[in-house]
Curated annotation (Swiss-Prot):
One of its GO terms (molecular function) is NADP binding. The keyword Glycoprotein does not apply. Pathway: Amino-acid biosynthesis; L-proline biosynthesis; L-glutamate 5-semialdehyde from L-glutamate: step 2/2. It comes from the Bacteria. This is Gamma-glutamyl phosphate reductase. The keyword Translocase does not apply. It comes from Phocaeicola vulgatus (strain ATCC 8482 / DSM 1447 / JCM 5826 / CCUG 4940 / NBRC 14291 / NCTC 11154). GO terms for cellular component: cytoplasm. Belongs to the gamma-glutamyl phosphate reductase family. It catalyses: L-glutamate 5-semialdehyde + phosphate + NADP(+) = L-glutamyl 5-phosphate + NADPH + H(+). It is found in: Cytoplasm. Keywords: Amino-acid biosynthesis, Cytoplasm, NADP, Oxidoreductase, Proline biosynthesis. Its main location: cytoplasm. Its EC number is 1.2.1.41. The gene is proA.
Length: 417
């Protein structure tokens, strides 16, 4: 435990060096990091293969754990995009002069040290560092033991780049040892860590929220819905449903439940037809089951149970239910949704407006799949996570969400009466 505490102290000490680091140096470091990551593709894949060998390929985490040359290139491009974005730190948010001549300035500043606890997602290691570094924060990483080989090689590349290019302390990033003890230490590192952000499934997020003694921003699980309205376009709907469900089933913005207006049940087979090609299992309520049983493969069609709705599948599985009205659809989402991403397919402006106003989620879509809930797609570069809470940050969290603010008060000897 003392060894972990020493890491906390060193990171806390190192973060002060960023306050005087020019943005040009930060950007040069990020560009160099992207180049070095791509140059080390073969080494990274070798280490990643060790992690993959220990995991069952049928595990939903397997796809998130797996790195490829294409994915490494995409991660590097994300780092480069972060380098092109303006730093939020030091930005003047407001200014005022009080009647006594005292000047008040509200300035954005980094949190300081951010702790990230995440599962088998080695891409998070690089994404988090890039965003923390650009926004003026140091970071302490607690990755899942499933990705330990991958994370260690990536942190090694980051630290060497910090030393070689920026001549900064390698303790601007630290990777904690595998195991629950280091995770618990991080959750209780009050005085060393300013903020904890968990990235993973519901179990991890609940554990962090219930045990942390320092502030937490939840990047919650995604139970995402598409509601096909009575005035929805079938071609758009079929494309949106398939993209939202099958583009990457293991991510939090993937579709979990299709809600269809009862007046459009005759179109249900067409809306779901593309899912057959990806062997998506459908768990349908009784009404929808009867409309699908003559067209959807019997081995892929199942009756919904009481546990079906509200489940984040992270797999080639999807729930289907029908509602009488848009109000009933919104009510269903309010009960079973997680506040992540929700979509309506409709050509009716009034229906779209109602859905946008009444659905309580971080991201609400009209005729666009939930798969777009992503920092890169929102123009934020990489993302540190997708917040499903309402305080401080909501939705994809980029650079701006990694800053808070402080007040600068300047005067000439004024005293309060």
């Amino acid at each position: 435990m003392e060894q972990i505490k020493d890491i906390f102290k060193q990171v806390r000490q190192a973060k002060g060096s960023l306050a005087f680091c020019k943005e040009e140096i930060i950007n040069d470091t990020l560009y160099a990091l992207a180049d070095r990551v791509e140059a080390a593709t073969d080494r990274i894949l070798e280490e990643n293969a060790k992690d993959l060998a220990a995991m069952d390929p049928s595990n939903p985490k397997y796809d998130r754990l797996k790195l490829t040359a294409e994915r490494i290139h995409a991660i590097a491009q994300g780092i480069r995009q972060v380098a092109t974005l303006p730093s939020p730190s030091g930005r003047i948010l407001s200014e005022a002069v009080r009647p006594n001549g005292m000047k008040l300035t509200k300035v954005s500043v980094p949190f300081g040290v951010i702790g990230i606890i995440y599962e088998a997602r080695p891409n998070v290691t690089l994404d988090v560092f890039a965003l923390c570094f650009k926004s003026g924060n140091a970071c302490i990483l607690k990755g899942g033991s499933d990705a330990d080989f991958s994370n260690r090689i990536l942190v090694e590349i980051i630290r060497n780049t910090l030393l070689d290019v920026a001549h900064l302390s390698p303790y601007l990033v630290a990777l904690l040892p595998a195991g629950h003890d280091s995770a618990d230490a991080l959750l209780h590192a009050r005085g060393y860590v300013d903020l904890i952000i968990p990235r993973g499934g519901k179990g991890l997020i609940d554990y962090v929220r219930q045990n942390a003694t320092i502030p937490v921003i939840e990047t919650g699980a995604g139970v995402c819905h598409v509601y096909f309205d009575k005035e929805g376009d079938v071609a758009k709907g079929a494309a949106i449903i398939r993209n939202a469900k099958t583009r990457r089933v293991s991510v939090c913005n993937a579709l979990d439940c299709l809600i269809i207006d009862v007046n459009r049940l005759t179109d249900l087979s067409t809306l779901c037809s593309g899912l057959q090609q990806d062997n998506v299992e459908i768990y349908a309520d009784d009404l929808c089951y009867n409309y699908l049983k003559t067209s959807y493969p019997s081995h892929l069609l199942k009756h919904a149970s009481t546990d079906t709705f509200g489940t984040e599948f992270l797999d080639y599985k999807m729930a289907v239910t029908a509602t009488m009205t848009i109000q009933a659809a919104v009510a269903h989402i309010s009960i079973y949704g997680s506040g992540h991403s929700e979509c309506i397919v409709t050509e009716n402006d009034r229906a779209a407006d109602y859905f946008m106003k009444m659905v309580d989620a971080a991201c609400v879509y009209v005729n666009v799949p939930t798969s777009f809930t992503d920092g890169g797609e929102f123009g934020l570069g990489a993302e540190i996570g997708i917040s499903t809470q309402k305080l401080h940050a909501r939705g994809p969290m980029g650079l701006e969400e990694l800053n808070t603010y402080k007040w600068i008060i300047q005067g000439d000897g004024q005293i309060r009466q």
